[in-house]
């Protein structure tokens, strides 16, 4: 949704501002969303939680274990189910009538059904939190130390000289690059994760970072 700074403030004052945060898992979306909800009274909707509730998973770890890795049996079918569930959850979040809605999307929001993604883009101010190059290694490590379900969308391939896990690490930058392009295509605003995660960035500065340039 293309809006200027005046529209941004006016919608916020009326309780009609709609923001969607997009980007990779562990890049700082939930951290940002929680801070904004606490200090600026946004109505936060966490799509991950909607999906977990629908599927009966108690934690993100349970969800990740159910989905598995792209080299495990049945992954393709479970990946398809995940996208279907995410489409339903994202549609539900978009339909919210709450004041100043803030959607914390999943990293795979770009794979939901086209009509739902289009509805999100047309009705929400989309903020993309882009992975700073200094954070890429941390994201890879977080993926294994703090598992989250990840849609690989055919970007994983087994490398002959590497184990399946080593192949995941090797293919991760390719997945990041493919997603970067997809995120940028739907973003109204791009913010570096270096700004989002910087402890010196206070909540007021964070709110300003979100706003349109003009």
Regions inferred by a protein language model and the residue ranges of each:
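Hydrophobic anchor at the beta1->P-loop junction of P-loop NTPases
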Residues: 21
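Walker A/P-loop
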Residues: 30
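Short glycine-rich anion-binding loops that position phosphate/pyrophosphate groups of nucleotides
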Residues: 106-110, 132-134, 196
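Post-Walker A helix-loop "phosphate-sensing" segment adjacent to the P-loop in P-loop NTPases
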Residues: 38-47
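NTP-dependent small-molecule kinase module
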Residues: 1-16, 35, 39, 100, ...
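A glycine- and Lys/Arg-enriched "phosphate-lid" helix/loop adjacent to the NTP-binding pocket
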Residues: 122-178
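Walker A (P-loop) phosphate-binding loop of P-loop NTPases
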Residues: 26
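ATP-dependent small-molecule kinase phosphotransfer cores
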Residues: 50-118
């Amino acid at each position: 949704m293309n809006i200027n700074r005046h529209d941004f403030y006016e919608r916020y004052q009326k309780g009609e501002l709609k923001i969607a945060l997009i980007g990779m898992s562990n890049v700082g979306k939930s951290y940002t969303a929680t801070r904004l909800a606490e200090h600026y009274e946004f109505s936060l909707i966490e799509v991950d939680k909607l999906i977990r509730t629908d599927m009966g998973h108690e934690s993100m770890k349970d969800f990740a274990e159910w989905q598995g890795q792209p080299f495990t049996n049945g992954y393709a079918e479970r990946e398809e189910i995940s996208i279907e569930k995410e489409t339903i959850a994202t549609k539900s979040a978009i339909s919210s009538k709450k004041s100043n809605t803030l959607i914390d999307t999943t990293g795979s929001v770009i794979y939901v059904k086209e009509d739902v993604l289009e509805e999100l883009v047309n009705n929400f101010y989309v903020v993309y939190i882009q992975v700073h190059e200094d954070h890429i290694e941390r994201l890879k490590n977080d993926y294994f130390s703090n598992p989250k379900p990840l849609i690989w969308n055919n970007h994983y391939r087994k490398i002959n000289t590497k184990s399946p896990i080593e192949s995941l690490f090797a293919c991760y930058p390719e997945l990041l690059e493919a997603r970067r392009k997809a995120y940028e295509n739907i973003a109204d605003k791009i913010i570096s994760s270096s700004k989002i995660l910087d402890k010196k960035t206070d909540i007021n500065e964070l709110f300003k970072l979100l706003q349109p340039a003009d």
